[in-house]
């Protein structure tokens, strides 16, 4: 489950038009959502509130295995539509398998002029969190320098606790990190710097194929374009088959390919590293069939009385299964990783990953599954609470109210987690076990409860 601060940050990126998916660091994001989910350990409570669209507060407490807590504050320069935990779209609050949209060039905010002078300012986000009783302080500042450039500054201040036994002074754990991202849609470059170990890094991601149309192009397309104009002659002939054109070969997966690499160097440690990766994603975007069904017209009978139509109960299957295939290679460490993730049905996604080291011959095979839980259409409309806002039309496929994730690997680790919504709260419950240990088969178990309000 995403923390409240992460949810606000993603909402800020969406409001400002920044694509956080077009990064080399997120190359394996789809498979990681199924294979690397974080199981809560102990007992955690989080309460957050949005007094106004610009300012947010969040408080968290860990009761087990030790008592600790934190408080955080978030301020943004633009209004954010942050919903409450009872009304927010459930899938927006957790990492999940998804084939992301085609990359597009980021667009800046509209210019605002007053008395012949430009008065609009660039958007920014400020975030700070203080941990008790450790006294650690985290801070984040993110701003848009231009429509295609974003700067993020993160700082960590962790006071040194205790006196070392050998009398030597411990290394200061405080650190400041700079991150500069330049995204033009077709490619994205990321520059990073860490002051703790004087590490410099650069990441690059290139997308092959066409870019998604901008909002201006989409608007012009919706308003209609004169395809008979000379400049649009190619569009009018797009559907005409050439004499030498061959028929498309059926079968296989159609999609887009992205390749990237990263290079980093530490002046303090006098070490360097490099890695490269490739990703294949199917097209079009993996939107569920429920999102492709238009809302019923006023003349459509009420599904709660007459029942949904057979076409809605049996939606058209995917023309091709939503699939993501990735491969990473680190030549200096000798690490090779390949992953395959696909949605095999409407509510089930499967993933597998193989890791191998060419130097030590160590290998690991990991398998995972993601299964979405839905309420029946009739129960989802009849079980609404008093005063709760009901949807304008009931979903014929049922409302998603939970997800079950499972992971198993060849190192005998098995993880199982359930995430769902109980009344107005978001709840995560998970367990991690070690099948090779008879003395302690359960390594960790935990539950996390989150509640936030926008009123």
From Swiss-Prot:
* Region described as Disordered: spans on this chain: 216-249, 278-311, 377-399
State the superkingdom.
Eukaryota
Say what the protein does: Component of the ERMES/MDM complex, which serves as a molecular tether to connect the endoplasmic reticulum and mitochondria. Components of this complex are involved in the control of mitochondrial shape and protein biogenesis and may function in phospholipid exchange. MDM10 is involved in the late assembly steps of the general translocase of the mitochondrial outer membrane (TOM complex). Functions in the TOM40-specific route of the assembly of outer membrane beta-barrel proteins, including the association of TOM40 with the receptor TOM22 and small TOM proteins.
Q: What is its main location?
A: mitochondrion
Name the gene.
MDM10
Alphabetically sorted, this entry's keywords are:
Membrane, Mitochondrion, Mitochondrion outer membrane, Transmembrane, Transmembrane beta strand
- Give the quaternary structure: Component of the ER-mitochondria encounter structure (ERMES) or MDM complex, composed of MMM1, MDM10, MDM12 and MDM34. Associates with the mitochondrial outer membrane sorting assembly machinery SAM(core) complex.
Record HAMAP family: Mdm10
Localization annotation = Mitochondrion outer membrane
Q: What is this protein called?
A: Mitochondrial distribution and morphology protein 10
Q: What biological-process terms (Gene Ontology) are attached? A: establishment of mitochondrion localization; mitochondrial genome maintenance; mitochondrial outer membrane translocase complex assembly; mitochondrion-endoplasmic reticulum membrane tethering; phospholipid transport; protein insertion into mitochondrial outer membrane
Q: Where is the composition biased (Low complexity)?
A: 217-227
Which regions are flagged for Pro residues bias?
A: 291-301
Identify its membrane topology class.
Multi-pass membrane protein
The entry's cellular-component GO terms read: ERMES complex; SAM complex
Q: What organism is the protein native to?
A: Coprinopsis cinerea (strain Okayama-7 / 130 / ATCC MYA-4618 / FGSC 9003)
Family of this protein: Belongs to the MDM10 family.
């Amino acid at each position: 489950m995403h923390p409240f601060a992460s949810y606000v940050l993603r909402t800020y990126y969406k409001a400002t038009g920044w694509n956080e998916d077009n990064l080399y660091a997120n190359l394996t994001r789809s498979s990681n959502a199924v294979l690397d989910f974080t199981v809560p350990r102990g007992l955690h409570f989080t309460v957050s509130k949005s007094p106004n669209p610009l300012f947010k507060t969040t408080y968290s407490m860990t009761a087990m295995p030790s008592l600790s807590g934190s408080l955080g504050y978030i301020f943004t320069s633009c209004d954010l539509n942050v919903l409450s935990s009872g009304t927010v779209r459930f899938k927006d609050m957790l990492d999940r398998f998804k084939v992301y949209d085609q990359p597009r060039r980021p667009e800046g905010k509209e210019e605002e002029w007053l008395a012949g002078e430009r008065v609009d300012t660039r958007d920014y986000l400020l975030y700070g969190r203080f941990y008790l009783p450790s006294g650690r302080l985290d801070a984040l500042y993110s701003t848009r320098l231009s429509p295609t450039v974003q700067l993020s500054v993160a700082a960590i201040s962790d006071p040194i606790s205790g006196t070392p036994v050998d009398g030597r002074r411990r290394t200061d754990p405080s650190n400041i990190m700079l991150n500069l991202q330049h995204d033009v849609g077709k490619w994205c470059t990321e520059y990073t710097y860490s002051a703790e170990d004087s590490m410099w890094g650069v990441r690059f991601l290139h997308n092959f194929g066409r870019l998604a149309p901008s909002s201006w192009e989409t608007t012009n397309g919706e308003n209609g374009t004169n395809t008979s104009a000379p400049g649009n002659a190619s569009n009018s002939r797009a559907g005409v088959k050439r004499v030498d054109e061959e028929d498309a070969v059926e079968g296989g997966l159609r999609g887009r390919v992205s390749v990237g690499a990263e290079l980093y160097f530490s002046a303090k440690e006098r070490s360097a590293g490099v890695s490269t990766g490739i990703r294949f994603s199917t097209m079009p975007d993996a939107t569920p069939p429920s999102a492709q069904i238009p809302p019923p017209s006023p003349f459509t009978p009420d599904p709660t009385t007459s029942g949904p139509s057979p076409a809605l109960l049996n939606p058209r299957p995917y023309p091709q299964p939503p699939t993501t295939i990735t491969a990473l290679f680190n030549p200096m460490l000798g690490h090779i990783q390949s992953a395959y993730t696909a949605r095999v049905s409407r509510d089930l996604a499967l993933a597998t990953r193989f890791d191998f080291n060419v130097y030590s011959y160590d290998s690991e095979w990991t398998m995972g599954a993601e299964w979405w839980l839905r309420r029946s259409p009739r129960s989802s409309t009849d079980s609404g609470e008093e005063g709760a806002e009901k949807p304008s039309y009931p979903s014929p496929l049922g409302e998603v109210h939970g997800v079950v994730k499972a992971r198993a690997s060849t190192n005998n680790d098995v993880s199982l987690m359930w995430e769902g919504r109980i009344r107005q709260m978001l709840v995560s419950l998970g367990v991690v076990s070690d099948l090779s240990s008879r003395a302690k088969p359960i390594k960790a178990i935990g539950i996390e409860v989150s509640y936030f309000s926008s009123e």
